Amino acid sequence: MNLLVTGGAGFIGSNFIRHVLLTRGDTRILNFDKLTYAGNPESLRDLAADPRYDFVRGDINDRAAVADIFKRGFDALVNFAAETHVDRSIEDAATFLHTNVSGTQCLLEAARAARLPRFVHISTDEVYGSAPAGSSFTEETVLDPRSPYAASKASADHFVSAYANTYGVSAIILRCTNNYGPFQFPEKLIPLMIANAQEDKPLPIYGDGLQERDWLFVEDYCRAIVLTLESGTTGEVYNVSAGSPQPNLTIVKTILKHLGKPESLMQYVKDRPGHDRRYALDSSKIRRQLGWKPQVSFEEGIRRTIDWYLSNSAWLDHARSGEYQTYYDRHYTNRSTTFSG
């Protein structure tokens, strides 16, 4: 297979590329990535010498560059390219509209023109909004995005569906719960808490910390993407989840326990505007139709994740250089504190 991956220098994209090259020996991958703040070439440095892997720096909104890339001929595209952090979308919604909506449409148009055999679009559970206690969203749930980020991803999903229905683009949408694992940018909850705890810095927790998220180890998600790529049904949406939502506070306490750090490091800060209370997905469709199920328990996954960050301090230091500290101070250091753990 000749595979185009957009946004492959980010967290899930880089893990996916590594997973495919390790498990699909006959696959060639071109990674097309703009290398924004969260796109880290260090995440794929060990693959630079692999003849099956190629990298081109570029913007999915650059229609000429995208058209030129498509001339190489691909069997499929997996689109990870996106702005993904909710806090940043609250500050700058226009960037999310430009990248996540306009950029996706640009890729869809190129795929239509090239008659691409397969287009897999990576979406998010956040398009559904906040799930009531005891309920789980199915693929038929009406979308109800609550943040600019979620709205941009929901809009992109609608464009993917529209191109499939109107132009016959062979597209599939994947909506997954929160991922965690190696190479995740430290603005996200789990790597942020690991990094701060290791340095005995305060661990900022939004509101009461009881927001529930369903955490899936990134390796399990990569397997789901490969299955969808190879066996998924065109035009379908597949939810992907571990099926066991946990409060953020429980996650933070688990990290502190693994690191042998006190809960007094926890610091409760003013909650995010419009913060969804709970995400939960029903993933029975992909389990039933494609035979997927998670293989890594949260206990194993969080241990592997913590060990990876502790063993890769140089990668973490690189990720936290540049504008990261300014962002961190704006969102956490200068955010009003409610009380400490």
Segments (PLM) and residue ranges:
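N-terminal Rossmann-like NAD(P)+-binding domain of SDR-like oxidoreductases, especially those catalyzing
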Residues: 1-179, 304, 309-312, 318-341
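C-terminal substrate-binding subdomain of Rossmann-fold SDR/epimerase-dehydratase oxidoreductases
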Residues: 4, 16, 58, 191, ...
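Residues that form or flank phosphate/diphosphate-binding pockets in enzymes
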Residues: 12, 38-39, 64, 184, ...
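Residue-level signature of the cytosolic catalytic core of signaling kinases
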Residues: 40, 49, 133, 182-186, ...
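Short aromatic-enriched loop/helix-cap "lid" or pocket-rim segments at secondary-structure transitions
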Residues: 41-44, 131-134, 184-187, 251-252, ...
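Proline-centered turn/helix-capping motifs that create local helix->coil transitions or kinks
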Residues: 120, 129-133, 168, 184, ...
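The catalytic Tyr-centered alpha-helix of NAD(P)H-dependent dehydrogenases
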Residues: 145-152, 176, 182, 186, ...
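Hydrophobic alpha-helix immediately C-terminal to the catalytic Tyr-X-X-X-Lys motif of short-chain
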Residues: 155, 159, 163, 193, ...
